[in-house]
Design a protein with these regions (language model features):
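Feature activates predominantly on carbohydrate-active enzymes
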Residues: 1-63, 140, 152-167, 177-209, ...
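Acidic, Ser/Thr-rich peripheral helices and adjacent loops at domain boundaries
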Residues: 44-51, 246-260
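Conserved, mostly hydrophobic/aromatic
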Residues: 161, 220, 232, 269-270
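Catalytic-core region of carbohydrate-active enzymes that cleave or remodel glycosidic bonds
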Residues: 203-231, 245-255
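Catalytic adenosine-cofactor/nucleotide-binding cores of aminoacyl-tRNA synthetases and other
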Residues: 239-242
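Catalytic domains of carbohydrate-active enzymes that cleave complex glycans
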Residues: 262-289
């Protein structure tokens, strides 16, 4: 969402597939497009000077958007991919609806819902035409899209609903009984890294205790969020412990006593301090706890 784009190098898909990695995109990047880095370069390459990232603009503009999404699906069709459906603005901005701006109140909300349902149908059609098989598809009811979902937006049963935390480690909402019964199931988008206005960001140092993360994810599991877990980690190196913990918890979740000794084990194996201790113990120069 914030840097580079997976599609920029065609070999990325093959390498990820070779390593057993399932690739997906965030809540604002549909059908494997990283809009912040792909939309404008793609328009320039195609020579489209009047297109906008807004599905409310009918006619040729919609056809250009469908072409943009379709080419991404074609590039990744041979790999294991999670496709995000729906639409928000470029780079985590709001849902663009310039053709609906004259509407107000409930009329505007109904028009937004109808538009988003149309977008999802058209995206599903692209996937069916290009893949000819079922694949993992997600929908993220987040920010302004959550309001539309709560007011009647119909999301196809096979789509996995991805719920988010509040950016500070607390899961805001669990699926209700009806949502738990969905064919596509439910997932979570959890932050160990957050890019926000000054004073709120924590990009490279996680401020959420692992014990709190465990409690929140355990409650999520117990409330039916069991299909897909996504962790926002920002930089890889500073959050190695959190990444390892998240992955191991996802593997063991549901088992009695899962992950109660993980932090101690990880510390003994992975930290520079313990590596120094092991080497010093061999020389018997001092004792380490």
């Amino acid at each position: 969402m914030h840097v580079n784009s997976f599609n920029a190098k065609p070999e990325n898909g093959a390498l990820a597939d070779q390593m057993g990695i399932v690739v997906g995109t965030s809540h604002c990047d549909m059908l494997m497009r990283s809009n912040n880095r792909e939309w404008y370069p793609w328009l320039e390459k195609k020579g489209y000077q009047d297109a906008v990232y807004d599905y409310s603009v009918p006619g040729r503009n919609r056809e250009i958007l469908k072409e943009y999404w379709r080419e991404s699906v074609q590039q990744n069709r041979n790999f294991e991919v999670s496709y995000t459906l729906g639409m928000r603005g470029i780079h985590d901005s709001g849902f663009e609806i310039r053709s609906l701006e004259k509407l107000e109140g409930e009329e505007l909300r109904k028009a937004k819902i109808h538009l988003l349902e149309t977008i999802i149908r058209d995206q599903e059609k692209i996937l069916q035409e290009e893949l000819g098989k079922e694949t993992l598809k997600t929908f993220v009811p987040y920010k302004e899209v959550l309001e539309l979902y709560d007011h009647g937006l119909e999301v196809p049963e096979e789509l996995t609903l991805i719920w988010s935390n509040d950016n500070y480690g607390h899961i805001r909402r669990y699926p209700n009984r009806k949502e738990q019964m969905r064919k596509g199931g439910n997932g979570i988008y959890y932050h160990n890294s957050y890019w926000a206005p000054p004073g709120n960001s924590y990009l490279f140092i996680n401020s959420i205790p692992i014990a709190h993360t465990r409690n929140e994810l355990w409650k999520a599991w117990e409330n039916g969020i069991q299909k897909l877990w996504v962790l926002n980690i920002g930089g890889l190196k500073p959050l190695e412990e959190e990444i390892s913990y998240f992955l191991q918890l996802g593997w063991e979740i549901g088992k009695p006593g899962a992950m109660t000794e993980d932090v101690d084990a990880w510390t003994k194996e992975e930290t520079v301090f313990m590596k120094v201790c092991r080497s010093r113990k061999k020389r018997r120069s001092f004792n380490c706890a």
